[in-house]
Amino acid sequence: MTPVVIFTYIPAFASDSNENVNIYNFLLQMAVWQAASGKVYLPPSTPVARVQSTDEYVQRTNIYYHAYSDRLLTVGHPYFNVYNVAGSKLEIPKVSGNQHRVFRLKLPDPNRFALADMSVYNPDKERLVWGCRGIEIGRGQPLGVGSVGHPLFNKVGDTENPNSYKGTSTDDRQNVSFDPKQLQMFIIGCAPCIGEHWDKALPCAEQDIPQGSCPPIELINSVIEDGDMADIGYGNLNFKALQQNRSDVSLDIVNETCKYPDFLKMQNDVYGDSCFFYARREQCYARHFFVRGGKTGDDIPAGQIDEGSMKNTYYIPPNNSQQQYTNLGNAMYFPTVSGSLVSSDAQLFNRPFWLQRAQGHNNGICWFNQLFVTVVDNTRNTNFSISVNSDGTDVAKIADYNSANFKEYLRHVEEYEISLILQLCKIPLKAEVLAQINAMNSNILEEWQLGFVPAPDNPIQDTYRYIDSLATRCPDKNPPKEKVDPYKNLHFWNVDLSERLSLDLDQYALGRKFLFQAGLQQATVNGTKTISSRVSSRGTKRKRKN
């Protein structure tokens, strides 16, 4: 409420016996309260919880480890899974350069390390965690451009430079191939990468959608798993549900869902576990311009609007003697993209990346001793063509070539190697720190086994030998629950690095790069190798006396 002052002007008339009229002016002032027209923003009644950065409660040590994987190889068909004749057994998996490779790196528990110098931390008051400081994703195989396509691709003709008008027919599909959009990307985090795609949505209950109408679509967030297809130029869409003609895209995605990382969601995550940092490089251009075949679902606005009251303002109808009058083409235009030049000058892989400050509150701390590395790289997208003589005769004795006697096979290979620089960090077991971690994920405290363990009432327990026999009592109906993996229903490329850690950083390529890049030197203190700043041995330069 705001006060409002109102002034009232009242004229008064008075006369005497001599009929002289006097005019008196009265000005009255009064104040009233009126509702405020603007909005008033009040502070919240309770304080808002503040999420702390890991740098505020994680203490970093000067102990670094180098972790590395084996050479990771995979071989398969670039377009689809190959099953046996009965279709009951998968014989050859789908391995494409346009797939996401999601590595789940398992790290050892640092709290179970037998450290030579036990003064590094106090197990009664602290817990150890890993901090990621550097990573290098190695890629083998030469650079190459792969092609995708469909033997029955839905295209009527070229719409960029047509030489004759071509309408639609019953079946206009052609055998078309093209190279996909060029994509290099990797995302590092201690939780799986969050992806997004467009999918078929449920219509409202009161809506009566006729058969053949376009369904509503919605944006879906889901975890990017190993083997999920990336965007190759046709968008992040559930093609299996939204393209029922099975001919609008290439074979490798016609029955798949293409996902794209939801960078907006991960950047605004309050904890930032899904993405510490990422690197991305995409490029494409439109190479060919085609038009779809089939009946157009959304006609060009013309006389069908308002019972013919609206004129056609998009084109002038052709003459009835022209082909365009009886067989008008549709307006479903689309391009086929191309990734263009593949060069070693623009490679994100086979080079180190150092993490100084993450984009979120988690500055590289690997909760649950694991790290997720999501990779896409189709710059090494060569597909091998393997031909086999089917009749078994000696190839040197074949006189006339007959293509029916040779079977052609396609194979694609992937080669990876991952190296890490891990920093040993410690977290004090203080009340405010534990409250912060418990609000973030209470399973972390269970992993640290911080619960109170009461003393046993009776040190002697009964143990039956044949507990499942009919002669003994029934076993316990409520056995102790095993630890449940939150990602057990998701598919990742699991890489165990529990026994692949080393303190000898100077013995590995990434370790030497880290020492030289940071200007550090390695020393051994009480049997534990530590890292310290490099001190220059050069003396002070003296001025020359005149």
Swiss-Prot record:
The keyword Disulfide bond applies. Belongs to the papillomaviridae L1 protein family. Forms an icosahedral capsid with a T=7 symmetry and a 50 nm diameter. The capsid is composed of 72 pentamers linked to each other by disulfide bonds and associated with L2 proteins. Binds to heparan sulfate proteoglycans on cell surface of basal layer keratinocytes to provide initial virion attachment. This binding mediates a conformational change in the virus capsid that facilitates efficient infection. The virion enters the host cell via endocytosis. During virus trafficking, L1 protein dissociates from the viral DNA and the genomic DNA is released to the host nucleus. One of its GO terms (biological process) is virion attachment to host cell. It is found in: Virion; Host nucleus. One of its GO terms (cellular component) is host cell nucleus. The gene is L1. The lineage of its organism: Viruses, Monodnaviria, Shotokuvirae, Cossaviricota, Papovaviricetes. SUPFAM superfamilies: Group I dsDNA viruses. Its main location: virion. Self-assembles into homopentamers. The capsid has an icosahedral symmetry and consists of 72 capsomers, with each capsomer being a pentamer of L1. Interacts with the minor capsid protein L2; this interaction is necessary for viral genome encapsidation. Interacts with protein E2; this interaction enhances E2-dependent replication and transcription activation. This is Major capsid protein L1. Keywords: Capsid protein, Disulfide bond, Host nucleus, Host-virus interaction, Late protein, T=7 icosahedral capsid protein, Viral attachment to host cell, Viral penetration into host cytoplasm, Virion, Virus endocytosis by host, Virus entry into host cell. One of its GO terms (molecular function) is structural molecule activity.
